[in-house]
Design a protein with these regions (language model features):
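Gly/Pro/Ser/Thr-rich low-complexity, intrinsically disordered segments predominantly at protein N-termini
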Residues: 2, 6-181
Length: 181
C-alpha cells in the first residue's frame, strides 16, 4: 500500500492533517502511505533497537536510539518527513519533542514487500545526501543486511548468519545468527 497519491507538492502540514493512526512519509513533496508492519518486521525492529540501546547504556554513550514511529526531518525543507524503522542520533541538539531535525547518524530500514523500492533506492539517496553516516537495509525475505557507510564510501552485504559491525561504533557487533526472528 506504499503509493504516491498525486503529482502536486505536499508539505509537513499535510502529514499532520492525516487522520489519526494513518502513517505516511513525505519525500520531496510526495506522500507515501505506509502499510502496517508484519510481526517479523516488528520482531526484528524490537530486537535491534534493544541491542543498540543496551550497547549505548553499557558504554555511557550520548547517542539515543528510536524505533518507528519517530519523526525525522532530514533537512530544513518542509517537503520531506520520514519515519525510519530505527534511528540513532548522537547530537542532542537535533532532538526536540517532535523528533529529529537533521540527519540521524545511523538509520536502519527493515524491508517489507511494499517498502522495497523506497528502502533500496529513494531513501538510500535521500539519506546519503542528507548526511546520514551509516544506513543498514535489513531484508528478511532475502535474509540479508546491506550496510552503507557513507563516511567511508563503502557498501557491504551480510547474511542472517553473520555478525555485522556498526560503523559509528568501534566495538558494536550485532550477531544476526543468534537473533531469533
Amino acid at each position: 500500500r506504499q503509493m504516491c497519491i498525486r503529482d502536486s507538492t505536499y508539505t509537513i502540514e499535510d502529514i499532520y492533517a492525516l487522520p489519526e493512526g494513518e502513517r505516511a512519509e513525505l519525500i520531496d513533496g510526495q506522500i507515501y502511505y505506509m502499510a502496517p508492519p508484519s510481526r517479523k518486521h516488528q520482531r526484528i525492529s524490537t530486537r535491534l533497537t534493544s541491542i543498540i540501546d543496551r550497547y549505548i547504556e553499557d558504554h555511557q554513550g550520548q547517542c539515543q536510539v528510536y524505533a518507528a514511529p519517530f519523526a525525522v526531518y532530514l533537512d530544513e525543507s518542509t517537503n520531506t518527513y520520514v519515519e525510519p524503522d530505527i534511528s540513532v542520533i548522537c547530537d542532542p541538539n537535533k532532538l526536540n519533542d517532535k523528533g529529529c531535525n537533521g540527519a540521524p547518524d545511523w538509520i536502519i530500514e527493515i524491508v517489507s514487500p511494499a517498502s522495497k523500492r523506497m528502502d533500496y533506492y529513494t531513501k538510500l539517496f535521500k539519506y546519503r545526501t542528507a548526511g546520514v553516516k551509516e544506513y543498514w537495509i535489513v531484508d528478511p525475505d532475502k535474509s540479508r543486511i546491506i550496510v552503507y557507510n557513507f563516511e567511508q564510501s563503502t557498501m557491504d552485504e551480510y547474511s542472517f548468519t553473520d555478525s555485522v559491525k556498526a560503523g559509528i561504533y568501534n566495538d558494536l557487533l550485532i550477531d544476526f545468527n543468534v537473533l531469533s526472528f
